[in-house]
Amino acid sequence: MNYQILFNPYAGNGRGEAEAQKLSAYLTDGGLVYHNMTEIKSYASFFETLSGEDILVIAGGDGTLNRFVNDTDGLICPVPVWYYATGSGNDFWCDLGRKKEDPPVCIDPYLKDLPTVTVKGKRYRVLNGVGYGIDGYCCEVGDRLRASSAKKINYTSIAIKGLLFHFRPVHATVTVDGVAHSCRKVWLAPTMNGRFYGGGMMPTPDQDRLNTDGTVSVMVMNGTGKLRTLMIFPSIFSGEHVKKENAVRVWVGHEIRVQFDRPTPLQIDGETISGVTEYTMCGRMLPLQKPKISAVGE
């Protein structure tokens, strides 16, 4: 048996390959074959090289998983898929109750019938969630900084500076299963499949990615000034922001459409799309059995 390791060298601020090498401490019952994900041209061809006894292990972060689930959309992986977190945020890993450098686990149940989002006429599969508002702005600024410097990106600093000086709130229409809600002065409007995004923020603390109804949750933070928003913002890391009912609302549904009155950056699992005026996210349609998470050595 071989563990076929798909690693992203750019994950974890460029330490993806070195972090993936740590798998040798966990996967001791078979051979380890490493593949640079950025060099794979066709997953259909790659899957044909796998044998029935192989296990595919993805080593990367949330963006790595997003690329994998979208690059393999419509394909069936012939072997089990495991995951080992080597990213900087690791929101999916955190949602599973795992910690950095925990052993890899099988994630097949979490990749089935994923929610989809349509942006600018293109459909994407969504693992964690879609960020729209100042969170999308932060990803766009972070991308620019990453392109010009090797330093670690401080998204908290970007968010604070954005709140105070650069990002202007928008007016939005949020339509949940056909019911429209008008929202003025919107700072955040993410729709989530899991609980976490943005490196530990928890906009929808009650969202369950395997809920039997297949629903997703949208959180809107709006109607507040800069300083009030800045005071509320830190509580999003604990999920306590939802108690601020005069500033935060959460709706749950199968189809959620968010429209802004001007183009704003959007991010899907950390991957940025600029100049977006609306998106539509559809939840899962198939009921799933909740898996028991087990890892190497457990």
Language-model-detected regions and their locations in the chain:
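Glycine-rich phosphate/pyrophosphate-binding beta-alpha loops
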Residues: 131, 135, 188-204
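Short glycine-/acidic-enriched loop or helix-start segments at secondary-structure transitions
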Residues: 16, 67-70, 92-94, 137, ...
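Gly/Ser/Thr-rich active-site loops/lids in small-molecule metabolic enzymes
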Residues: 146-157, 199-227
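Catalytic core of DAGKc-family lipid kinases
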Residues: 6, 37, 74-187
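ATP/NTP phosphate-donor binding region
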Residues: 1-59, 66, 70-75, 98
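ATP/nucleoside-binding phosphotransfer catalytic cores, i.e., glycine-rich phosphate-binding loops
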Residues: 178, 210, 220-298
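A generic structural signal for short beta-strands and their flanking turns/coil linkers
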Residues: 170, 185, 212-217, 254-256
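Flexible, charged surface loops at secondary-structure boundaries
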Residues: 48-52, 181-184, 250-252, 259
